[in-house]
Amino acid sequence: MKTSEVKFFEAVKLFNEDFYWDAIEAFQDSLSDGLEDRYVDDCFLNIAVCYMSLKLFNEAEVYFLRAIDAGSTSGDQIDFEGPIFGKTSDRAYLGLARIALVKKEFADATNILEKLKGTESYIEINGEKISMYDICNEEVTRVKDILSK
């Protein structure tokens, strides 16, 4: 296994243990060491999720966009990670929609929602497969309802 892959998997471990700053650094190190293309979109996605967890939404947005771009370059294959099944780009779009909602940019959130329409990506919750589109649609609707009261 290459050094860059070892660093990537170490970063995943740090991420799973909620050591977000350390994970970001380790993910960036793996990229600097020439991480294989097939992991680059996941690496950017994980960095974005770390920033989201730290409530650094502008930084997260940058890395979600990089994940989408890297996925389009590498073929954006369907991944299976625990209860999540689907393309990295779909997960990144869901993240971007959540950022738009935090910023109260509802038109942007709705536009992003449309990009998830028809996707095969889903999250399995209590044995039920819920599409990324349905998750995003529910979140957009809920936030709009809360703020309209």
Language-model-derived ranges and their functions:
Residues 9, 46, 88-91, 95, ...:
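"A position-specific structural signal for the A-helix of alpha-solenoid helical repeats
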